[in-house]
């Protein structure tokens, strides 16, 4: 199973993205591709904020991802696990969000995380294979 990080989702959705082709391939070809609902919120935020995609189009694109990969909401237990792991591994600031993704990926049995930001997972997921497209 393969967890897809927000950067992969954004890159796959935007044809003008410089890494669109490899991100789209990761979305379409990854074995057992899945993500968490928090990554959908991050995707919407990135599309509307950084890329200035109109909200209606960003919502349609983001929610359309459900047709291409499994998406699951995060329970409180994942947040508790992530905060504890972040503290033990020295993860600080916004790194908690990558810790949250990593905790979820582990719980779901992922063997790998595909991301455009491998350094973000250096402390959060040293036990998982981290791939870039």
Where in this protein do the model-derived segments appear?
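Anionic, Ser/Thr-rich low-complexity intrinsically disordered regions
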Residues: 71, 124, 131-132
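Short loop/helix-cap segments at secondary-structure boundaries that form the rim of catalytic
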Residues: 119-127
């Amino acid at each position: 199973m393969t967890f897809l990080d927000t950067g992969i989702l954004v890159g796959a959705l935007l044809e003008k993205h410089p890494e669109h082709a490899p991100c789209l391939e990761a979305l379409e070809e990854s074995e057992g591709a899945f993500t968490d609902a928090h990554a959908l919120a991050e995707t919407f935020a990135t599309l509307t904020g950084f890329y200035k995609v109109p909200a209606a189009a960003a919502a349609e694109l983001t929610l359309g991802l459900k047709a291409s990969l499994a998406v699951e909401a995060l329970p409180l237990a994942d947040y508790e696990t992530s905060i504890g792991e972040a503290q033990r591994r020295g993860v600080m600031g916004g790194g908690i969000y990558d810790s949250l993704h990593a905790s979820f990926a582990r719980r779901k049995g992922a063997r790998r995380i595909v991301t455009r930001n491998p350094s973000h997972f250096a402390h959060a997921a040293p036990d998982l294979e981290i791939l870039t497209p």
